[in-house]
């Protein structure tokens, strides 16, 4: 929306439009907010909601900010000129400005200007000629600040708080547009996908605030003024839900509203939003006394010889992290440790503190020595005397004090900067710190996962690079752990369902975990309409299954009684022939899809499973399996047991799955199918009936419970253990180790002792070692 045309009143939602906007409404023209809402609903893209562009702006944000600051410092102010500059600044913020405009200096300058203009507006009478231009200046500056925060929170370093921009986007929408059913908007699929993604990110952010509030707070505190807009989110979601005509999207909006309520509670609990009794002070935007929202002052306080220290009482209070007088923005503190000194510049950039804290957490470094030290630290944390900032202070002091110590290297980067590497519990920690002429540490940072070497000092950097390769390289190239997982599924109490995952458990969606599961495929398998299957599909009138099929469908199935089809595609053609061309093709397709869902598991072939799109609200079983590993269930009704398998390589596990998938692809090509259960002109059978029967006989079938009499039947545990067993056998043979038999993670992993034959279509053989040989 164009900030120059909008004036937000303290209690209005949505914002009212002035002048040209009202005339546009009278002439049935679209307001800027309606245009952006239509574009966003159609595309589902975040930038569309804010009117942002990916192209670079003609105006440079930093230079405009400096010009506007100088104009505000003049003795005689020209508010129309200032309003025009503020409008240009807001427009520049919508384009790609690079990363320089997201620095702390630019953020503090912009927030200071907003605070100054709001204070002056509060002291200006509404009848004054300067009131309207000044109000536009405030609105445009707030718009620029919003885009500044959005740009930073959508960056890779702020991935944990990515849900906040999504929620802010929903506040910008005009809910009436949804009710109008605009021309050309035939579907709400993209909008619904965005809502589902926002809900998932909101839930993840709430969980991170519960499990690790310090790290998330460090990312959100610099944007405390922006996230205050989230107070309007419940009303915005209620309006969108009321006006949305699409039922699935409306249900997703209700679910998002529930997740949002939990998030707002967590934000208030961590003093990132005002408490309920303070909300009224936020709504009154024109208060005389203004307070500047600043980052928490994570100063580096006095540290003893062992690196321990205490925080000042003022910095330990949560309320001091959200609000501080304007003069506090430039305050800092310094302290010394023997041989080194730690200064307060690190506190000036919350992103630096977050990076250093993440490095400390990665290496599990702690000051505590023994049980007594850990108890002391726990008591200090409960009393508010230890937070992320204080731990970063001690960590920087520890790293800077490593010169000349075993397992530590120092590399001169120039301009007082040093790169320090120290071995901590078998892992190499890496930071950069800067010293002044007195040897006092005045700044520190984490150089990133792949730090750049200083130009001209490549030869001197050899020792440090060698140390990093020795520890960090080994860590980066270490083999991926493999876990056998058993969990309970819907309707079951005990964890009988089994599968294998390569990755690190309980690390969320971005952990990179890979699912290696085998299960029944409802779109692949024969259909034999014998008496048993007919009774299951048609059955009695009071049968639960038969009641799900209409009378014409039952009649068509009965007409095919006794027939046997090698593939689902053959059954599809026969069913369509019985139903005739008078029936709509889409209706016939839906009928057959319903039949496929009701076919017994015993008619399904066993193939590797694939995880679906993680953004969907109701994922299929493979995606639920992966989610249970990435976020271990905490509910009492959900159980997941893990067993780490040591003698296996994830690459061998991948090869085993590829071998199984090769069998699937070969069989699909020979039988003329594409995995959808629907015949296609592009896929025609390439074998005769005799060869087809041989292929079908070599295909493993799903059988839930033992006894599994042959290596061509099994369940999910059988498939998972077969893949894992093949990978373990490959690993033990390569490393001359004794054979090892794979077992499930739970005693309820029924079928894990049985093995499937993984057939190789290239030579016609199967890996059908008996489980007794292992």
From Swiss-Prot:
A Pfam family hit: HopW1-1
Biased composition (Polar residues) is annotated at: 24-33
Q: Tell me the compartments it is located in.
A: Secreted
Primary residence: secreted
Q: Which domain of life is it from?
A: Bacteria
- Protein role: Induces hypersensitive response (HR).
Q: How does it assemble?
A: Interacts (via C-terminus) with Arabidopsis WIN1, WIN2 and WIN3.
Q: What is this protein called?
A: Effector protein hopW1-1
Write down the species: Pseudomonas syringae pv. maculicola
The gene that this protein is the product of is: hopW1-1
């Amino acid at each position: 929306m164009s900030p120059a045309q909008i004036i937000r009143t303290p209690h209005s939602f949505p914002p009212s439009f002035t002048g040209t906007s009202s005339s546009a409404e009278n002439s049935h023209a679209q307001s800027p907010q309606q245009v952006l809402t239509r574009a966003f609903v159609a595309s589902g893209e975040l930038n569309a909601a804010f009117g942002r562009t990916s192209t670079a702006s003609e105006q440079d944000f930093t230079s405009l900010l400096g010009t506007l600051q100088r104009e505000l410092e003049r003795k005689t102010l020209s508010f129309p000129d200032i309003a025009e500059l503020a409008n240009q600044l807001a427009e520049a913020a919508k384009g790609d400005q690079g990363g320089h405009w997201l620095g702390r200096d630019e953020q503090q300058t912009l927030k200071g200007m907003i605070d100054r203009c709001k204070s002056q507006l509060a002291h200006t009478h509404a009848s004054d000629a300067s009131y309207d231009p000044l109000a536009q200046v405030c609105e445009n500056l707030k718009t620029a600040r919003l885009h500044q925060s959005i740009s930073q929170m959508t960056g890779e370093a702020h991935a944990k708080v990515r849900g906040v921009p999504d929620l802010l986007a929903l506040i910008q929408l005009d809910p009436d547009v949804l009710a109008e059913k605009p021309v050309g908007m035939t579907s709400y699929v993209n909008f619904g996908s965005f809502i589902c993604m926002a809900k998932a990110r909101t839930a993840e952010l709430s969980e991170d605030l519960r499990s690790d509030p310090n790290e998330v707070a460090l990312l959100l505190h610099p944007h405390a003024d922006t996230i205050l807009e989230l107070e309007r989110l419940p009303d915005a979601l209620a309006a969108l839900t009321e006006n949305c005509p699409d039922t699935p999207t409306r249900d997703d909006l209700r679910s998002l509203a529930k997740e949002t309520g939990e998030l707002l509670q967590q934000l208030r609990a961590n003093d990132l939003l005002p408490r309920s009794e303070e909300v009224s002070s936020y709504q009154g935007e024109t208060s005389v006394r203004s307070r500047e929202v600043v980052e928490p002052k994570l100063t580096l306080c006095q540290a003893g010889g062992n690196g321990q220290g205490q925080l000042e009482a003022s910095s330990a209070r949560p309320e001091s992290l959200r609000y501080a007088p304007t003069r506090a923005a430039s305050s800092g503190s310094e302290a010394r440790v023997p041989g080194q000194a730690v200064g307060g510049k690190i506190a000036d950039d919350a992103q630096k503190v977050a990076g250093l804290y993440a490095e400390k957490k990665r290496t599990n470094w702690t000051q505590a020595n023994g049980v007594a030290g850990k108890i002391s630290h726990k008591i200090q944390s409960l009393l508010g005397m230890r937070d992320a900032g204080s731990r970063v202070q001690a960590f920087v002091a520890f790293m800077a004090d490593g010169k000349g110590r075993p397992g530590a290297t120092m590399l001169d980067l120039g301009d007082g900067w040093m790169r320090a590497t120290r071995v901590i519990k078998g892992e190499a920690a890496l930071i950069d710190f800067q010293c002044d002429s007195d040897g006092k540490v005045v700044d520190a940072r984490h150089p990133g996962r792949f730090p750049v070497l200083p130009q001209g000092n490549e030869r001197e950097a050899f020792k440090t690079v060698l140390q990093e390769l020795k520890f960090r390289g080994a860590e980066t190239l270490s083999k991926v752990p493999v876990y056998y997982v058993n969990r309970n599924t819907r309707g079951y109490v005990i964890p009988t369902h089994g599968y294998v995952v390569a990755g690190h458990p309980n690390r969320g969606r971005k952990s990179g975990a890979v699912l290696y599961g085998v299960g029944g495929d409802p779109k692949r398998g024969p259909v034999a309409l014998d008496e048993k299957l007919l009774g299951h599909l048609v059955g009695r009138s009071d049968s639960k299954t038969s009641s799900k099929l209409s009378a014409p469908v039952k009649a068509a199935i009965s007409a095919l009684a006794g027939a046997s089809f090698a593939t689902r595609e053959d059954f599809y053609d026969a069913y369509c022939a019985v139903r005739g061309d008078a029936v709509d093709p889409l209706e016939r397709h839906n009928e057959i899809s319903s039949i496929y869902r009701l076919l017994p598991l015993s008619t399904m072939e066993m193939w590797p499973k694939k995880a679906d799109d993680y953004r969907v609200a109701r994922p299929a079983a493979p995606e639920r399996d992966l989610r249970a590993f990435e976020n271990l269930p905490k509910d009492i009704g959900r159980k997941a047991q893990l067993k780490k398998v040591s003698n296996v390589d994830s690459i061998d596990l991948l090869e085993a799955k590829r071998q199984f998938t090769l069998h699937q692809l070969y069989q699909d090509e020979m039988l003329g199918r594409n995995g959808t259960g629907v015949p296609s002109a592009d896929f025609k059978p390439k074998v005769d009936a005799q060869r087809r029967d041989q292929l079908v006989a070599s295909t493993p079938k799903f059988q839930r419970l033992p006894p599994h009499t042959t290596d061509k039947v099994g369940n999910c545990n059988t498939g998972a253990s077969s893949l894992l067993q093949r990978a373990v056998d490959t690993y033990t043979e390569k490393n001359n180790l004794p054979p090892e038999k794979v077992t499930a993670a739970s005693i309820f992993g029924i079928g894990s002792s049985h093995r499937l034959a993984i057939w190789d279509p290239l030579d016609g053989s199967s890996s059908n070692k008996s489980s007794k040989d292992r």
